[in-house]
Amino acid sequence: MKRVVIGFDTSCYTTSVAAVTVEGEVVASCRKLLPVKLGERGLRQSEGVWHHVRALPERLEELAPYIRDCEIAAVCVSARPRDEADSYMPVFHAGDAQGRGLAAMLGVPCFSTTHQRGHIAAAKVDSGIVDGDLLAVHLSGGTTELLSQVGEELTLLGGTLDLHAGQVVDRTGVAMGLPFPAGPHLEKLAVQGRSEG
């Protein structure tokens, strides 16, 4: 029987629930983009929380068939955006509350992490990096930063003080008439452009 960790991440624009084996194999990842009206450049935090609360049960129902024959060893939640002491966004409370509740019901540990650490961990998995210290360039909607990771310690080395890379992508996409967040839609256009040559 596979032992899995159930992960929750409720960021500004995506509700995510996943199951990963304790060895690091992704069993399933269930995500839903939050709806943003065409032409708009985001949601208020209260709207984001409302959408996450509605989407989380559906994501868990979607995940359930993949983990029926698994033992849930732990739960992990993105409780805030970054490792900074003042890092806070209400949207993260939806996944944090759901995850902590699930862990309590199952009698398993619940580990708290940050959305930023999740991005870095995903990049490590995708690139095949298992262990070791690294430099990470974190480009997202809310951050454009250079970080050093030594062991588990993240140190901010620098970043932008103005517009973040993700904001540029989203604003460009919205100006082109694409839905927000525009990253996935621009990526699809780029792939189509390459295939049409």
Model-assigned labels for residue ranges:
Residues 3, 7-11, 18, 27-29, ...:
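A short helix-loop
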Residues 64-100:
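Short beta-strand-loop/turn "lid" adjacent to the catalytic site in phosphate-handling enzymes
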Residues 14, 78-83, 114-120, 143:
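Acidic, glycine-rich active-site loops and adjacent beta-strand->loop/helix elements
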Residues 30-32, 51-66:
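Short, well-ordered amphipathic alpha-helical segments that serve as non-catalytic structural scaffolds
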Residues 97-109:
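Alpha-helix C-terminal capping segments
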Residues 1-3, 108-135:
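Conserved phosphate-binding catalytic cores of ATP/NTP-utilizing and phosphoryl-transfer enzymes
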Residues 11-50, 155-156:
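Short glycine-rich, Thr/Ser-proximal phosphate-binding strand/loop in the N-terminal lobe
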